């Protein structure tokens, strides 16, 4: 009997699919049943070949050998996962297999994972596509009942290949050109470089910002009401101190007369459902989680616990076909503290409205929402619980009615000047009930603070007991943190020097710099290549990042290039542009970039050279700030030796409770804190033992230290090798 091979992206998803399809016979890298064979990738099993596979001379990085422009780019099996590739290959080549079902992630990159495997195996069998947004049993069954023809996704595959090949031509050539021309470990890409440029621009704005003092007037009445002065244009601030001084002087011994009380009934609706970027932003703001950490937690909640839908989505809407499943999802997530809220929503039929249901705004995947799967809170880690809580509360909030309130604006006259006060009466808590009325609005910028207003009628006279001048200073723009950098990457149009509205709109519609799936990796890569560094929560550009921006061609610094690329990649995905035309343009652009770098007369200055020499090659080591602490890195890119000087650990200072830094090597290692606390590693081991009631032994501490090491950047990987593996998305 003929069988179908199903290719999943990961073993965990493969196991779920195999269970539903009753494939319980275990093989080497696959699971088999009577009709289906389920096998899996491990992310990418196949990638574009390294430059030296085209010509042995490319093994060495020489400026004169650039640009590298092979006619056709070849595919190669990734060595580390070669065993699994062979397992997939053997199943695809089986004579009893007459059909391939692509069940990798539903999106551009997922398409590439499976199709590159199929292309490398050189197999020509009919292809079908499983396109689902969650891996619950129901979603898998429904998906297999509605398989799509593989041909429907040929253009999406072409778009993915075009993106990958363009990154190879431009990314590898630009990186080699910069590194060899300036004798420094420099890498750039169409997303990385404009992201660094945005951080640099923000720092320039802060540096050039000149604070101005502004003035206002506040009056206090005997019935504890605070009145705020406003000019004829409704402004509460003035930069003219003399003017404010004069007004305050002229108001002496005047009372306030109530001119009008304006009552307006207002509504505010819940913020939209989460896409990945919005969730990463909120998790960073509320819990300090990095973008990468949030994605990893989401992946567990999606794959392992099966309680949330596909995480790598850029949509904040659901499609109309999902509306019918909402009651089941509410029943599944409506347990524990969410039970009363879910019960309230289920009392009435759910009304789909455009604020969260819009087919036109859902492409590959809908917004992140709960699945119909059983929720076992006891299986969650603390971090998983927090992320799950964010998603469920947002899901419930969207299904709750609007927050309704009556806004009262009190307009009074003191002398010839207008003073106002503002208050609010809640009519219906609506969706704010989900957040126990503690939801904070980021967009509230009103100068006039709301207060509890006493009973007042129009025409009343209020006794003024105090009139005082207020003052403040304008603030410089805030430095980026991971939350705000994600926002800037998602919508970089304000940083673009272009009058092309269509291009700006495309960047906005295609999700800005990078994709929801790649932004976390890009930010991580910028930290690990020492172009940016973290001080507290703030992100700062390093000297290396500054110099890189000075050395790269101008176009690579602007989001415009990404806008143009995304416009064309979208056209390829829609069948409106040939992949070959796009790649030809990219090759020509590569020639221009390399030529510009070659002819540059600029210099790169290592201003972080330490007194230490590299133990491998003897050259001076550079001192850099990694994401987890200080490191020494060999300045020779071909050597690439790295050594930790200190790293931030999860151990807490017993005095101030901040994270401790671990410095030194071996038995001489010492924990240090910014508050001045110091503790030897041996003393730390003893303290941990006592705190845990003498249960901790040497093995426990070694396990703890091993966990810390796992969180470090990889050490002593030759930089050239690392660059080869970089994806310049």
Curated annotation (Swiss-Prot):
Cofactor: Mg(2+)
GO terms assigned for molecular function: DNA binding; DNA topoisomerase type I (single strand cut, ATP-independent) activity; magnesium ion binding
Site (Interaction with DNA): 61, 168, 176, 312
Chemical reaction(s) catalysed: ATP-independent breakage of single-stranded DNA, followed by passage and rejoining
Enzyme Commission (EC) number: 5.6.2.1
Protein origin, superkingdom: Bacteria
Entry's Gene Ontology BP terms: DNA recombination; DNA repair; DNA topological change
TM region positions: none
Pfam short name (any one): Toprim
Record's compositionally biased regions (Basic and acidic residues): 686-713
Residue span, Topo IA-type catalytic domain: 153-594
Domain (Toprim): residue spans on this chain: 3-136
Location of the region described as Interaction with DNA in the Swiss-Prot/TrEMBL record: 187-192
Keyword Magnesium annotated: yes
Residue numbers spanned by region Disordered: 686-718
Top EC category: isomerase
GO cellular component term, pick one: cytoplasmic replication fork
Binding site for Mg(2+): 9, 105
UniProt keyword terms in alphabetical order: DNA-binding, Isomerase, Magnesium, Metal-binding, Topoisomerase
Record-annotated active site: 310 (o-(5'-phospho-dna)-tyrosine intermediate)
Family: Belongs to the type IA topoisomerase family.
Annotated function: Releases the supercoiling and torsional tension of DNA, which is introduced during the DNA replication and transcription, by transiently cleaving and rejoining one strand of the DNA duplex. Introduces a single-strand break via transesterification at a target site in duplex DNA. The scissile phosphodiester is attacked by the catalytic tyrosine of the enzyme, resulting in the formation of a DNA-(5'-phosphotyrosyl)-enzyme intermediate and the expulsion of a 3'-OH DNA strand. The free DNA strand then undergoes passage around the unbroken strand, thus removing DNA supercoils.
HAMAP family (UniProt xref): Topoisom_3_prok (MF_00953)
Name of the protein in question: DNA topoisomerase 3
Organism: Bacillus cereus (strain ZK / E33L)
